[in-house]
Amino acid sequence: MAINIFHLNKHIGKQHVLKDICLSIGDGEVVGLLGPNGAGKSTLMKIMVGVWEGENGKGKGENENFVLQVPKSIGFLPEQNPLYEDMYVREYLRFFVGIRTNRQSPISHSQLVEDLITRVGLTAEANKRVGQLSKGYKQRVGLAQAMISNPELLILDEPTTGLDPNQLEDIRALIREMGKERTVILSTHILQEVKQMCSRVVIIDHGEIKVDKPIAEIDNLEETFKQATNNE
């Protein structure tokens, strides 16, 4: 299912953090969401997954009402992903599989857990407590959790922040693999990451979309980003 957002606005207190956002994303696209801190990237993602509600623009015509069309099945990895660190990895995933799926059989629950563990490369860590894991492996747990419902849309907010170079490449490889089967939207501060993983880039600054182009049409992403964000 395609994603369509029309005339999305959002205020937090007196601050207008998203301003008339219009965005359409086709099936199977991997979209990199770029922007400075506070640009509105995380707010947009939280509205897409239903954590926050969007708003109509003030004083706009009837034909400019806010519209949000997204798949029902969405996996979300927030930037600050709270994990139950006292639980073992396998136990943790089994807990969330039980909450998020309609499968009645404990056997099918267990099989899904094992499939997720294998898919994200947690086999050797499955019997460790989540709190014992490195940040890279904790991100794998978060990705497995986001994939429980085999979502049509995967939304990842800063999925590689704070990872060392080896962990970074491992997580990028996982995201590339997951992007072969679904639409992915990821936010990042790393321009090279967008070049490597994304088919399209959307740059947001001060709550507005400044650039929305296929990555193949951008000759110099660094320069495009600087111009879009007035960053000298």
Annotate the PLM regions:
Residues 49:
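Helix-to-loop junction immediately C-terminal to a conserved catalytic motif
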